[in-house]
Amino acid sequence: MRSISLMFLKRKKFWKRTFWFGLITPIIVFSILVLVVYVKQDSIVKNLIKNANKDFTGSIRIKDSHVAPFANFPYISIDIEELEIFEGKNRKKSERIVHIKDAYIGFDILELLSGKYDVKSVRLSNGDLRIIQHKNGDFNIIKAFESKKPAKEIEEELHLDLQSIKLDNIDVSKFNESNGIMVDVLIENAKTRLQSTKQNFTMNVDSKFQLNLIKDGDTTFLKHKHFEVATELDFEKSKQILKVEPTEITLEKATFNFDGSVDFLNDVFIDLHFKH
């Protein structure tokens, strides 16, 4: 009877140790990874900004950065505070295109273990994006991101391997200097999942936003219109065809659906099918 009792106690201790080992090990590993990111965050952020300012016509400026391990879970993130992007190098406020209070760049936990620091996710929270179409037809944001280097080389330098983008409370406006028309979109929240292969580029989007159309400083009939959009886009690289999978759009209380395609090699032929 005593031997049975001893065996029971041994098994109990074994399972208790196994339980605590299984519970504590992931916490220790996660803590170590957070510590690694904390130690290297300055060099990671400085290299990203240095390469971006070197590669692009525009310029980037930030206030500070810190580790935010749960801001974009399951990715371990660095919070870049007060991110600003300018059209040129002189950083005039009049040429500021982007101002984001918190920009979280996320890294995959498993890849960190192997020493890779590719940016897997971006989450932008509270800020604005001001797109201007100049009278000569140029866009300030396109000019800011002009580069003499191939896109693939830039991706490698910036360690970009984006799989998701999230937006929270981002005000996006596009102003046309020629006709004085401004389209303003207040994005309450948006989630985008990205997947790229040699053949296709796929993007899933779920978003809620408000739309305003402004002419010469005055709002038009499009004022504070609430939209919800859920769609999937699939771009076939070889055929240059964009497939629009079944999409649902809600405008105020009305909902409609559509799907179709855009053929860029055939004079940008648009073929959309709407459903009630």
Describe each model-derived feature in a short phrase:
Residues R2-F14, G58, P74-S77, E81-N200, ...:
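Secondary-structure transition motifs
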Residues R2-T57:
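N-terminal type II signal-anchor transmembrane helix
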Residues N53-I62, K239:
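Short secondary-structure junctions
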Residues D64-I76:
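Short edge beta-strands and adjacent turn/loop segments
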Residues K93-V98, N200, D206-Q240:
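Beta-propeller and related beta-repeat scaffolds in trafficking/envelope systems
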Residues I170-V172, Q240-I249:
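Transmembrane beta-strand segments that form the barrel wall of outer-membrane beta-barrel proteins
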Residues T250-T255:
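Solvent-exposed loop/turn segments connecting transmembrane beta-strands
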Residues D259-S261:
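Short, T/G/N/S-enriched strand-turn elements that build extracellular solenoid repeat scaffolds
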